[in-house]
Amino acid sequence: MAKNAASNKTARVAQVLLIALATGGALAGCAAPGAYRPELYAATAHDPYTLSAGDRLRVIVFGQDSLSNTYSVDGAGRIAMPLIGSVPVQGRTVTDVEREIAGRLREGYVREPRVSVEVEAFRPFFVLGEVTNAGQYPFVDAMTVRTAIAIAGGFGPRGYQGAVDLTRVIDGVPVTGRVPLDAPVRPGDTITVRERIF
């Protein structure tokens, strides 16, 4: 009987351990970013740039000085222009926005409008975690993770100097993965430097 009770107790302990391991593994999987998937980030590295809140656009309507100006993309992903009002730009390319503005101006405001849109200032990128000066910084073209960390003052004394976690919005969904230091950075990316394990 004592042998049977010990056997039951051992079985219960084993069940509890298995449940704890399974739960811990599941929670760790939720909290930790995915492994480095170069194809995911490489696929978006050379995609046409899409606009979002924080970008500043230079809009030129040729022959219409009152419409040509610099416009900031607001939190709703729109710019506000004279005559045509609010123009949605979130997730669109500058070419898409040129067509949209020209189409609206053609509706009774300007005959055969010629419109040029360019990004005057990109939205910032963010560096968090174990760096000297965490925060947001203005984007510079052809930037890598290494460059971004240097702009943030370099690694902190406890910063892991291998791969970092990079969060990028892809098709409207934030995706986080581990990337090497030579990975390209895009406007709006968030780089998180983890603490190294001693």
Residue ranges and their predicted role:
Residues A2-A6, L17-L18, G29-F198:
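Ser/Thr/Pro/Gly-biased, low-complexity, turn-/loop-rich segments
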Residues N8-A26:
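Sec-dependent N-terminal signal peptides
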